[in-house]
Amino acid sequence: MGRFGRLQDVLRSERFRPIPFALVLAVAAAIGTRGGVDLAAPTPKAAIARALSAHGIDASAEGVELSTFVVSRRPRSLGSVEVALVRGRSPSDDMHDLYMTFVRRSPEGVVLEISAPVNLTSSASVDEGAPVVSGPFVAYTTALDGAPKAIHVLDLRGHPAAESADFTSLQKLQSAGTEWQKTGLSQGIVHDVYTLAGDFTEARLAFRGDALDVGLGGGTKVVLDPGSRRVLEGAELLRVSLAEKGRPAGLVPWAVDRVRSVPAFGDENMQILKAVAFTGLEWAEKARTKVTGGPTVTAETPSGLEGLSQVTGGTVTSTRDPEVGFPPAPLEPILKPALPNEGTFVALENDPFITPISGVPAPFAQTFLRADPNRTGTRIFITMWDARVIALHMEAGTVEPVSATGEAGPGTIARTPEVLRNVVAGFNGGFQAQHGEYGMQANGIMYLPPKPYGATVMELRDGSTAMGSWPGNSEVPDEILSYRQNLTMIVQDDKWNPWNRTWWGGTPPGWHDTIHTTRSGLCLTKEGYFGYFYGVDIATEELGRAMLRARCRYGMHLDMNAGHAGFEFYSMAQGTGFSPLGRPLQADWEYEGQVKDFPDFRFRARRMIRAMGHMNFPRYIRRDERDFFYLTARRVLPGPPLDPGAAAWRVKGLPQHGYPYAIATTTARVEGAGSAIAVLEVDPKAVDPKDGANDDPTTVLALADRRGDAGAPTSPGKTALVLADGRFSLVAREKAQGTPLFTGNDAPTPATRAVVGVRDEDGVLLYAEIARDEPKRADALAGAAALLGRAGASKHVFVANDVAALLGGGLALDGERDPVPHGPVTVRLVRRAMPGGRPYFESTPVVDVSVWRPLQMQRVRYFAKPKPAPSPSASANP
């Protein structure tokens, strides 16, 4: 191997990397400062306020509260150490923060010693109010433009041991070290946030016994119980965010964060240290190459597809269904000669580590590319997914991003069956807030406002995943539910780095960044697919080169460095568990366990590639300190079999007019029926209602009353089936908006030949039709209704008339031409675009560095969103 190769391996080794950081951390931990005390101050509170001025904090005695919570009690001659909470601000800032300091007083109550203050809030955009204290509990408000926005409650007793019961011993030690550095208390401080849901002019706090009363003016109030962390009164006025510990990072990333948090060292020095270390490794690699004449293939760079598919049983694709269009076409390798299967996608069919999606082609595919001619041993691995079938979501961590309003994220995927049963993957987010304060909003909660011209991925309210460069303002369109920003686009308009950025996170700002390290990225392809990119020992230019070769329309940089970047697949099972794998789990990249806080669910997890060295595997299915993305399977047709006795769903050869499928048909035998019944399901997200009088080439389903042997139509039913807001629903006919698709009753009429219901979970229409010559008509209709109930439709009605349900406007449910006469079409369901991947903010121009950089360098500040002006006809509304 040679001495350079051995040196590089030592420098890369896990046992070496923590050493310099641990040494610096030990020195930093020994540094302590004690503020001078004015013994002549008239009151202890005045003494504390004056002492903080030595630390550059403006405070008054009125903004100081002493907690009866005693941190430690020494012999009475030395006094006890108590906690003081202080509302203060920097002289150059008009916003207050909440500071905490430890105070030692004499037996007579004279302040003898004060520790250096700790800023508990550091919120850039809201003003913290004066604290109120009761025992270990501290409460205060935050305000924006003078209006209260949230109530914050602190518990100085810290986090209960149960929150970290599943941590390793090392993780518990790390967690205690982090809390000690942040607060001076190894158990930390519990910080719950109760955000006000309405507009109020005041929020007056007062502890009354064990409860916290919050007066909101006009007789309105909320009451909180800090001890049980419950809302006793006014829950409808609050959005509650209860703090819980997230799992700490791996040892090396954790040590780096702890050192950069030491004021005497700081982030800039850490960036310099990292840049020097990476440059040294790069030098060692070049020197080694000169000696050995060949590239290094590290343990984290598998030589080909085996790191992706040797266990999963993936299928190398050569053809694809033109109706579906996924997996993507193979990618042309960048370096020649190409390695076997380089650029060829592996479809992850029947993968035991991905939650199954019935009836559709595999929505995930993987490949790899080499992009650096000087490092031909490195790989950039790509996982691509079909955004029409897979939805992207994002969640804030319990620590990152550090919010400008003081609100922390939950750090977990929502613990509800509706979400968990559809989770298929998770992966890392972007940079920490201190490295640019790039915007983030999750599920409508804004943690950091958007930066102008920032590279942005979004979840829209219709479920689509979008990507684009934010425009030059910070307004968030109502259509956007969630967004995450990071830097500027690596790739846009078929160009690498069109924004001419020079800093990509590997060096101090202002240095030219060509650092080779572990990097990750996300892209939207020209076909509308999304891809996650991961490479070890790569620079941003190589990442961008791979994105361009993958036909990315937009490409953005995500988090970087070993331990921070990672992608995991998940398979979720509720209740019954999994089918056996038939082999032992491979612990270096596979895992099976129970979902914490939701024991009814079990999960299997697998890293995207076997050698992916990210921290805390499995990471994203647990509670995490940092923000992350997760993927869920959309509810698309055809889904699982209707009934054990039902035939397979049919989707091919039907008038779908697009993908995912709009309709599916099957047949089933039901008890009491002489013949099989025909069943149709319609996805409400795939169709729009339209007047039946006008033909439409994208007609999926047309409805008409029959004439002929059924005679004239009977009276309409009392219940109507309608399509609105992306769901079918059954409503009283007199309340139906627009033309009902069907009307029906609780009992069949002489003309009834069909039953309709709506699946509770997703609003899908289920329509069951008996044969025209069915000899046991009543029994068949009853059996059809029971079948819809087993399929998830808790409500159903018997269609009042003999209705013709015509696929494409003329076909019976078996796909053949309907021979029975019918009247004019009354309503059509025509194809509509479904949620998927799409570009956003396409009109944002690429501007010069001199325009975007000053805007992105500004510290975030929130501004009250202007209320919409009333419409001209508002005064006429009742």
Describe the role of every protein-language-model region.
Residues 1-15:
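N-terminal Lys/Arg-rich, disordered targeting/topogenic segments
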Residues 13-878:
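Gly/Ser/Thr/Pro-rich low-complexity, intrinsically disordered segments
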